[in-house]
Swiss-Prot record:
Functional note: Part of the ABC transporter complex HmuTUV involved in hemin import. Responsible for energy coupling to the transport system.
GO cellular component, one term: plasma membrane
Membrane topology label: Peripheral membrane protein
Pfam family, one: ABC_tran
Protein name: Hemin import ATP-binding protein HmuV
Family, as annotated: Belongs to the ABC transporter superfamily. Heme (hemin) importer (TC 3.A.1.14.5) family.
UniProt KW keywords: ATP-binding, Cell inner membrane, Cell membrane, Membrane, Nucleotide-binding, Translocase, Transport
Residues noted as binding ATP in the record, renumbered to the chain: G34, P35, N36, G37, A38, G39, K40, S41
InterPro entries, alphabetized: AAA+_ATPase, ABC_transporter-like_ATP-bd, P-loop_NTPase
Protein source organism: Shewanella denitrificans (strain OS217 / ATCC BAA-1090 / DSM 15013)
């Protein structure tokens, strides 16, 4: 689905990403982990083409990302940013409906799609509420519903980029959103890249984990391969303890 080959990105003279190579497959959730400032969000910005690569190549379905027509790419690749500075004078339903454009389905089908995404994220009771009046967590879910509306029109399995999608959510909504991301991958073939800080969430919901530190990939693989005592010590300088439970293949990291 997505191939990142020897990508380097600088901000002025400062390297942000160094020799990043990574393959993202449809049907899987890949979690990006690393300390603050490691380069996780910079990688997502490169995939959205808001950061220019100095060298290397990013290909999406075997076509260089920069060669995709913008409208077609927008139906197949979308990002939920960590926070949004947008101030909509719209209702919740109207914000979610922005994901329909450019419209490739009938207006009736579009209205039904918006309603289904609102219901999916427990937003139906807020449909007619003014967007600016919402809490931070509610706004985060509204933007996720908008992004999912956008990708629902994709002509092929889409790529969903989530930059700390649970940062403003309570525990119940965190579980709901990450479970949804996993279902989109496993049931509908989405490729999902999610930036997380919670190691236990990464272990529970991700198929693959990529650890970035100082702009470089230092480890990647399954949760069992990556989330080891040595990795946590080397990257986070954290003397982790692992508690094994009967209902999980991965131990709890404390």
């Amino acid at each position: 689905m997505l191939n990142i080959n020897q990508v380097n990105i600088n901000l002025g003279r400062k390297p942000l990403l160094k020799n990043i190579s990574l393959d993202i497959r449809s049907g899987e959730v890949t979690a990006l982990l690393g300390p603050n400032g490691a380069g996780k969000s910079s990688l997502l910005k490169a995939l959205c083409q808001s950061l220019k690569t100095e060298s290397g190549e990013i290909s999406f379905y075997q076509q260089p990302l920069g060669q995709w027509p913008k409208a077609e790419l927008a139906r197949c690749l979308a990002v939920l940013p960590q926070s949004s500075s947008l101030s909509f004078g719209f209702t919740v339903e109207e914000v979610v409906a922005l994901g329909l454009y450019p419209l490739t389905i009938s207006q009736q089908a579009g209205k039904a799609l918006v309603a289904s995404q609102l219901a999916r994220l427990d937003l139906s009771p807020l449909a007619n509420q003014a967007y600016p009046s919402l809490s931070g967590g509610e706004k985060q879910r509204v933007h996720l519903a908008r992004v999912l509306t956008q990708l629902a029109q994709a002509p092929r399995a889409p790529l969903l980029l989530l930059d700390e999608p649970t940062s403003a959510l309570d525990l119940a909504q965190q579980h709901k959103v990450l479970t949804l991301a996993r279902e989109l991958a496993h049931s509908q073939g989405y490729g999902v890249i999610v930036v997380l800080h919670d190691l236990n969430q990464a272990a529970r919901y991700a198929d693959n984990i990529v650890v970035i530190n100082n702009g470089e990939i230092v480890k990647q693989g399954s949760p069992q391969q990556v989330l080891t005592k040595d990795t946590l010590s080397q990257v986070w300088h954290y003397d982790a303890q692992f508690i094994h439970t009967q209902d999980s293949a991965m131990p709890l990291i404390v």
